[in-house]
Amino acid sequence: WEDLLTDTDGQYIELQSGRVFNQPASNSAYTPYKHYAFAPQMTDEWTEYWYPVKGIQGVSKASRIGALHVTREAGSLKLAFSPLEVLSTDVKIYQDEKLVETLPLNTKVLEPVTLSAAKSIPEGHLKVVIGDDLLVYSENAKDYDLERPMTLPEDFDWNSAYGLYTQGEQWLNQKVWDKAELYLKQAVDKDSYFAPALVRLSSLYYREGRYAEALPLLNTALSLNTYDGEANYLYGLVNRVMGKTAEAKAAFSIASFAASVRTAAYEQLGEMYACEKNWAKAEHYAQKSLEFNEMNLDARQLLMLVYRQTGKTEQAKEQIQYVLDRLPLYHAARFEEAWLAGKHTADQLKDFSSLIRNELPFETYLELAGWYERVGCPDEALALLACAGKYPIALYQSAYLLSQQGKETESKAALEQANAQSPDFVFPFRPETMKYLDWAQTQSPNWKIDYYKGLIYWTNQQKDKALEAMNRCTPTDYAELYLSRAQLKSGQARLDDLLKAEQVETSWRVGFALLNYYTSVSDWQKVTEVGKKYTKLYPKNYYIGLKYANGLCETGQYAACVSLLKKMEVLPNEGSYAGRAVYRAANLYQAMDLIGKRKYASALKSIEASKEWPENLGVGKPYDDQIDSRLEDYLEAKVYDGQGQQEKAKACFNRVAEVKTSPKYFESARLLTALALREVGKQIEADAMVTSWAKDFPDSKPAQWCAAIYKGDTTKASELLKSRYSQQDTTPWEATYRDTNFDLIVRLFK
């Protein structure tokens, strides 16, 4: 894709290393290499080094001083080094533990150096040391191999309370809230007194603002162990939100016994005393918090506030400087610095605001304002909200706080302004925002308030409440309301909202949503109608184009599909595969039709075309040995068989039969392998393969379907297709298997 790069340096490779053993994917949860999570208010610091490597043709080992590439050429040892520092040191070359040679090394930054050793060391026995262990490269496996377990016990019971809890906790750590709730609830159902699951589930409910659901779980956990640190910490958080001050203080006090939540518990106590203007106790608990985590930023901010409120200006400045020396863009400290200097209005805070440059700056102001409101400082909160300009959620919060201060005229003005704003790019998600919206709805009812409430419920896994809120929205000309609400519905109700959105607004997003709906219900005629309409409106939008092409393919308009794809420019992106998948399917479906009509020469042309990887479709061609062409080869065999060219047919069947399959997952092309084995006279081997599927992949519907087809049981095969296999959604970088052949093979055997 060099022509798509924004530089002219050609192709490049980015090598990555990290703090943990792997870059965890979803399925890492089922290995020892779990997803890591941070403890409340803990600060974790590490250093990452990013640097270029040039002129050494590869990397054998890298460190903070540079990268080394070791090669052997004609019996000699070559050491190429790309330095990051000016060095004047030496390189020691060992055979096992025996020093063989020492070479001088003098470098300038990024000026590659190549050294040649007098003697080549046998592979597996070389060790290279630069300077005083500045970089150590060893080919001896014992220098790297660890004896720690690398696989999960085979008999680990994922359906036990602990197994279900582990799955829930791992989804929680990945921020996949719906799956986390599913597994944690199953763990509690399995064992209603399994404390870790009770605590984790309550933490999820707290995060989602479901306080009434969290409280009974925490009561159960505390009835098992009144000193459970995490349970007490969460019990404190929930009770604090619910206004039960004594309960919250007691809970945080007991939580401080546990090292995992101690720093956070003390800081929470400090906040509560700050809210009561008990500055001495607020300072005491902030200091206690810092004893266990000197970089607890909330505790530092609390001290800044305490010292400012008690007139200890120099101590406040010391705290501010301590943080800014380490984190120059920590906006809470910058705000305290500005407030201390007497800058209390949005105009006066322009210098402060000038460095808040993220894509959603109003979220930074809302986060800071929420903290000041929690510690009883509404003036500071209002000043921060004013910096957010006309962002509706900030205006609703301002209106609420102004009303709390008795400033009803200003409150009403802010509320009217909030209701007048467009909902475009407004994505509220914090549960605590709900109280401002509930209040606003009692003061000045407006459909936008219900829409915002629906978004908050939705993002916090309360889809029924989200739909209730959005259903209360009166008819409006805001298409995004209908698009959003449609995703909370199903069937005809979903389609009705999508059609309402289309009546209100013609946009590619509306068209794409309609195409997704019709695709989901396999209404391919509608896909082609809507696809044709929106492709004319948005000819360069390949998201629309690919959906339209898929519709053409599924309705048998193969030539039109391929023609459309040839005109399309799909930008390559991580995990994308759709463009080439539709192209391949169109050609192979056409080949199947042509074989059925005995047009063998034309069928061969379609099969050959299916093997191409057109660059304009945005999917890179893998290496040949990574391409599964069993379906293409099987169809070719059928063509040659139909033409009476038995030797060519047998050669194709042999290619299919010889493919080695992965033991990790079931691919539907195994059916073709089994059939090919049978075609070349290896019936026993084919039967054994099919029999093994039930044992190796007992829950795989595709495996059961393939076995039914192999055995000629078309009735069972048809029944299995009613519960279609669906690919689990994953992130693009995950090494997940996608069976690209299943739909094609289903069509073949229809």
Spell out what each predicted region is.
Residues 190, 224, 257-258, 292, ...:
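Structural marker of alpha-solenoid helical repeat scaffolds
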Residues 1-43, 51:
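A contiguous, surface-exposed recognition patch within enzymatic or periplasmic domains that forms
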Residues 200, 234, 268, 302, ...:
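Canonical tetratricopeptide repeat
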Residues 160, 169, 194, 203, 228, 237, 262, 271, ...:
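Residue-level recognition of tetratricopeptide repeat
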Residues 197, 231, 265, 299, ...:
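TPR alpha-solenoid repeat register
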Residues 60-159, 331-333, 404, 408-433:
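Long, contiguous interaction/recruitment modules in multidomain scaffold/adaptor proteins
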